[in-house]
């Protein structure tokens, strides 16, 4: 079994390609999302809900996080930005890992795109935390393979996930987090999340943002 090193937080987003932030104002805002999955579900259209093969809600796309998006933009010094997608992820108990990939493999953009990943509970190796290859964002977009894993509710259409085996597992570091912390990564940073081996759902929200104007 591989022993992954822990993220130390000593390197910046620019150097490592990812960074964990703590912000009390954002912590209050995201607490609104941590109470009731059904409440969040009502904010979405049925076509935006993906389910696992067992029928569990896996993710909900195209949510409106409003104020939260503006608060997150401040963390990376974005003066103007465009929200590409907001998602709500609900990883069921005893559910598989999310394979290693770069977010940019999904949209292949030359723009400055960042993903904010915000757990709604403490996360660690047991209940599925994130893993990154530090500095991998500077390499650019790498080859990926398509894996069909998601089923969109009502339409029955299968979505797809992408996988890359470019890096060895030993090159990843694990990033355990506390509820209220915010993780941001570059569009080209290689990452995956471990299986949820706990008996509870692991819930997180993501905000994918394109910076159109920096403060500096």
Q: Which role fits each region the language model picked out?
A:
Residues 1-8, 34-44, 67, 145-147, ...:
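Non-heme Fe(II)/2-oxoglutarate
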Residues 95, 111-113, 182:
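Coil-to-beta-strand transition motifs
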Residues 108-125, 208-212:
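Short, conserved beta-strand element in jelly-roll/cupin
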Residues 23, 102, 120, 186-187:
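Residues immediately flanking
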Residues 1-102, 106-109:
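Non-heme Fe(II)-dependent double-stranded beta-helix
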Residues 101-113, 177, 200:
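A short beta-loop-beta micro-motif enriched in histidine and acidic residues
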Residues 18, 111-117, 127, 172-174, ...:
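Extracellular structured ligand-interaction cores
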Residues 125-190, 214:
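Double-stranded beta-helix
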């Amino acid at each position: 079994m591989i022993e992954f090193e822990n993220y130390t937080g000593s390197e910046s987003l620019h150097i490592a390609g990812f960074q964990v932030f703590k912000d009390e104002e954002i912590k209050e805002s995201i607490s609104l999302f941590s109470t009731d999955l059904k409440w969040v579900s009502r904010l979405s259209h049925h076509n935006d809900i993906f389910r696992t093969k067992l029928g569990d809600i896996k993710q909900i796309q195209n949510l409106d996080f409003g104020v939260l998006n503006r608060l997150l933009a401040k963390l990376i010094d974005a003066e103007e930005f465009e929200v590409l997608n907001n998602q709500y992820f609900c990883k069921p108990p005893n559910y598989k890992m999310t394979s290693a990939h770069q977010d940019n493999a999904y949209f292949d953009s030359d723009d400055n795109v960042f993903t904010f990943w915000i757990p709604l509970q403490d996360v660690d190796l047991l209940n599925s935390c994130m893993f990154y290859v530090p500095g991998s964002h500077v390499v650019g977009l790498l080859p990926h393979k398509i894996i069909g894993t998601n089923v969109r509710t009502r339409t029955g259409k299968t979505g797809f996930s992408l996988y890359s085996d470019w890096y060895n597992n030993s090159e990843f570091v694990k990033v355990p987090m506390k509820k209220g912390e915010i993780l941001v990564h570059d569009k080209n940073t290689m990452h995956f999340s471990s299986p949820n081996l706990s008996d509870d759902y692991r819930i997180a929200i993501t905000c994918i943002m394109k910076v159109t104007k920096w403060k500096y």
